[in-house]
Design a protein with these regions (language model features):
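Bacterial N-terminal signal peptides
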Residues: 10-19
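Small beta-barrel nucleic-acid-binding modules, primarily SNase/OB-fold domains
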Residues: 2, 6-7, 20-146
Length: 146
């Protein structure tokens, strides 16, 4: 890559980091955001037109939970993943107020990790109580196929 492109990429990364860190300590009200859709129980895609351009479209992962994967290792995991996605989308669509808190980058820098509050209720508690997620602290994940 040319030096100019590298400089632009570094400048964009600094801008995104500064803008993101300015939001990280506060609740981010998602009520006017559009296009929210959950891929599975712990990953959602959002469009946030009120944020700076680099942050308007992003993938967010819910902090503190592990849910079955859509690209499952077994039929039971796939079945649970579909239920988790349905649960997540239903909860997000029904909420009048969606707020993100404790925003931070994941370890690869491609997704935002967040706590989500739906009408004041912590989403991860709701999906764990529904039996569609497990608490997760970053360690080794248990298989959903056993």
């Amino acid at each position: 890559m040319s030096t100019r492109i590298n400089t632009l990429l570094v400048a964009a990364a600094v801008f995104v980091t500064v803008a993101f860190n300015a939001l990280a300590d506060d609740f981010l009200n998602m009520r006017e955001f559009r296009g929210n859709v959950c891929y599975d129980g712990d990953t959602c895609y959002v469009i946030a037109p009120t944020l700076p351009e680099p942050l308007q479209k992003m993938s967010v992962r819910i902090l503190g939970i592990d849910t079955p994967e859509m690209r499952a290792e077994c039929a039971e995991e796939k079945k649970l993943a579909l239920k988790g996605r349905e649960f997540a989308n239903k909860m997000f669509r029904a909420a009048e107020k969606i707020e993100f808190a404790n925003l931070k980058w994941d370890k690869y820098g491609g997704r935002v990790l967040v706590d989500v509050y739906l009408d004041g209720k912590l989403y991860k508690d709701e999906i764990i109580n529904a039996g569609l997620a497990r608490p997760y602290d970053g360690g080794t994940k248990e298989s959903w196929c056993e």
